[in-house]
Design a protein with these regions (language model features):
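Amphipathic alpha-helical assembly/interaction segments
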Residues: 1-144
Length: 144
């Protein structure tokens, strides 16, 4: 099925799953963190999906820049989830799904950037993300 808009991108769909999970996790935080860590987590998760959607409407080079922005926001999400466990606000079990979704979205973003001809991988991309198979490009970038 050809991609007609950003909603057809599986990476955007999975980013929306991550967004939903981050909102769920934010509700587990104590009230004192609702407007600090919780709100920041929600904004970062929204930014991942928003960068993908907004970039899809642009030219290739701008789309690549937007995917880089999505990756940066994704790293924020991961850091905020890990920070919540570091300061004992959440358990590892409570952030596990979010971390798994973040890993999946990260691999898909890397594969999509490669398929669009990104000149190099963004610094900080994990080694398993760098080894994403080329078959994952079409599976990760398009709706099936």
């Amino acid at each position: 099925m050809p991609i007609q808009n950003y909603r057809d991108l599986i990476v955007w769909q999975r980013a929306m799953d991550l967004l939903t999970e981050c909102y769920r996790v934010a509700r587990l935080l104590p009230p004192s963190e609702t407007y600090a860590l919780g709100a920041h987590l929600e904004r970062a998760a929204v930014a991942v999906a928003a960068h993908i959607a907004g970039g899809h409407a642009r030219e290739r080079a701008e789309f690549l820049e937007s995917l880089t922005g999505a990756t940066a926001s994704l790293r924020e999400v991961e850091t905020l989830l890990l920070a919540a466990t570091r300061v004992c606000l959440l358990s590892g079990d409570q952030i596990q799904t979010g971390m798994q979704l973040a890993d999946e979205v990260g691999r898909m973003l890397t594969a999509l950037r490669r398929s669009l001809g990104a000149p190099h991988l963004q610094p900080g991309v994990s080694s398993h993300a760098a080894g994403a198979p080329s078959a994952g490009v079409s599976a990760g970038a398009t709706a099936g």
